[in-house]
Amino acid sequence: MADNFLRQVYVAISSLPEWKMSGGDAGASTVKLFGDGSFDQLRIKFTLHKQQPDAAIPSSIQIYNLSKELRGELSKVSGAKVKVSAGWANAPVVEVFTGSMLYATHQREGADIITSLFVLSGWGSAHQAACIKTSAQDATVKDLVLEILNDPGLPGITVDPKNIVIADQSFGNQGWTFAGSVRDALNKLSSIYGFSWWIDQNVFYASDDTAGALPGGEVVISSKEGNLLRAEPMLSLAPDRNQQYGITITSLFEPRLKAGFSVKLESELNPQLNRSYVILNLTHVCDTHSDAWISQVEALLYGVV
């Protein structure tokens, strides 16, 4: 029976673009797909990338042997809202991705037809929203970021000031003027004033490059808990000695991990690496029908740019 299988993945694909659904899903039809490793359910694979700062690297979702009709419909849709939820049958299933579908492809592999959805969180909102701004001379960088996020805003994206940790730098006498997309405006500001921004689960985040982890629940990856698979230091190749500046961690799939937030390592084999780190890059690699069910983390020591 299907309920004997522990891994579970749900994929929901809306008929409407993500940036047109800020008021909810009313008026949209949704295709819901499910896989759990059993032969009578779909095989679903995904590689989900989450970065801090935003690098606009698409994630991919692969679904095996969809109907010809559904494959045809997916080929016509661009910008559709996509949600992925995953977890274990004996624990709550967690939403791990919300974003826009950029495009879909189909290929035959042996007896299977594989549909690949390429998706990106916040892509539609950040690219569709136009930004024309001139700041006041006494405005701070954080003031302007919040102003951009509120007007023109990012449709469908949640903005909470507590997720924006930027120093109160002033523009001074020169002010600041920009015309373009919201994404380009934020990229220009971040490159000049030393902060990173990203969108995860349709929530906006920004942090100074030296601010450390954003406030929130720290996730522990531990030998004792059985979720740690591998941990290796990231070393700078200094002329006189190798100096650790971060860590790479491979764990069992851990949906609570978030880019920009803290992860704590508790390794019995490498206790010298045990401490808290700031997650820079995070990738979830999962497959309902193979051994792949992991999370891969690149994280920095606090204070490392």
Residue ranges with predicted function:
Residues 1-116, 288, 292:
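Assembly/oligomerization scaffold segments
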Residues 11, 44-46, 159, 164, ...:
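Generic structural motif
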Residues 12, 62, 85, 102, ...:
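Residues in well-ordered beta-strands of folded domains
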Residues 46-77, 210-211, 215-305:
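An acidic/polar, Gly/Ser/Thr-rich interaction patch typically located in mid-to-C-terminal regions
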Residues 98, 142-146, 183-187, 232, ...:
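Extracytoplasmic/secreted envelope proteins and their assembly/folding machinery
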Residues 109-224:
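Charged- and aromatic-enriched interaction segments used to assemble
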